Amino acid sequence: MKQVVIASRESPLAMWQAEHIRARLQALYPGLEVSILGITTQGDRILDKTLNKIGGKGLFVKELELAMQEGQADLAVHSIKDVPMDLPEGFALAAICEREDPRDAFVSSRYASLSELPAGAVVGTASLRRESQIRARYPHLLVKPLRGNLQTRLRKLDEGQYDAIILAASGLKRMGLAERIRMELSTADSLPAVGQGALGIEIRADRTDLMALLAPLNHPATYACVTAERAMGRALGASCQIPVGGYAEQHEHMLVMRGFVATPDGTTLLHAEATAPAEYADALGRTIAKKLLDQGADDVIDAVKAAG
């Protein structure tokens, strides 16, 4: 194989991620020509509505999959948290790279933490998962939708439209903006999204040549953790329309995982935790989902969908 084309969203963060994978591939295979095909996805174009109102995170990946299907690109680089739990038939995740910081970050010009915000302060987030956890812990705060790429969200904060915003720490760090983080929220305070902080490389399932080429980029511990998280999400029928979080960590050969399902207003928050050997990652995720369903998660999910 002499050349590879990477499909990527055109936001600065997405292009950084694609450039990162390009650099890693060229370091591994010095003779390989790697180019990037930038694509503006539907999710990037529709910015006046929240994702749960316009079809969810699949809007960020469909055009990239089409480019692979039509032979314009060989692979696509995604933030795993933006990838639907079920890939379309004919596609596969060839590699999941080592995870960056999975935590949520508190960003504000005036305040050092969520606990410092006064009653009625406006917090911006694009995520129902973040909203539900903030409203459960800080019911006196006002949570408002926040769309746009990373730079747009920071600009809206700086213009005074919000008192604080919550973003993925990994994105800020990858873009060299770690100094904007006032506080990283612990995973106990804000359980991350499924796959948060990890990059995934998607290919057509019939491209066995690419599967071998990309194998060195796969990080086994991250792959196991994300496999467990996505198995939980799949079993719950999770999407960005439902406040769901899942986070697994590997300690030696064991995975420790926590998951939650909530209502957006934070009045109902169901938690579950379990442990399993890393080779049973998929089963661990399904165990977490079952524990949540046994607590009534299906009723919560149905109620959120009906209200949606």
Swiss-Prot record:
Keywords: Porphyrin biosynthesis, Transferase
Modified sites of kind S-(dipyrrolylmethanemethyl)cysteine: 240
Cofactor(s) of this protein: dipyrromethane
UniProt-listed Enzyme Commission number(s): 2.5.1.61
Annotated function: Tetrapolymerization of the monopyrrole PBG into the hydroxymethylbilane pre-uroporphyrinogen in several discrete steps.
Annotated HAMAP family: Porphobil_deam
Further comment found in the protein's record: The porphobilinogen subunits are added to the dipyrromethane group.
Family recorded in the similarity comment: Belongs to the HMBS family.
Name of the protein this chain belongs to: Porphobilinogen deaminase
